[in-house]
Amino acid sequence: MKTLRLAIHGRVQGVFFRDSMRREAQRLGIAGWVRNRTDGSVEAAVQGEPAAMDAIVRWSYHGPQHARVERVVIEPDDGSYNSFEVIG
C-alpha cells in the first residue's frame, strides 16, 4: 500500500471539498483523512492500492464542482489508516 499527504490549494473551502473527497475515497477503497487548514487549503492523507491512489490524486486536482484548485503539493506519508474520515 502506498500512503501520501496532499495539500490542496485554491478555492477549496466552503465548496464541500472534504465531504466530496470522503465519498470519492470510499468509492475507491482509499483510507485516510481530510481536513481544512487555517491557511485556506485542504490537507489529506490517503492510503490505498496504486490504481486507486492515482485516481484520488487526479480527482484532487479538480475536486467537486465549485472548487477551483490552483495547486496540489504531494509528499510521502508514513501513516496507517483503516477508514476515511473528515477531521476538523
Model-derived features with residue positions:
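Intrinsically disordered, low-complexity, mixed-charge
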Residues: M1-G88
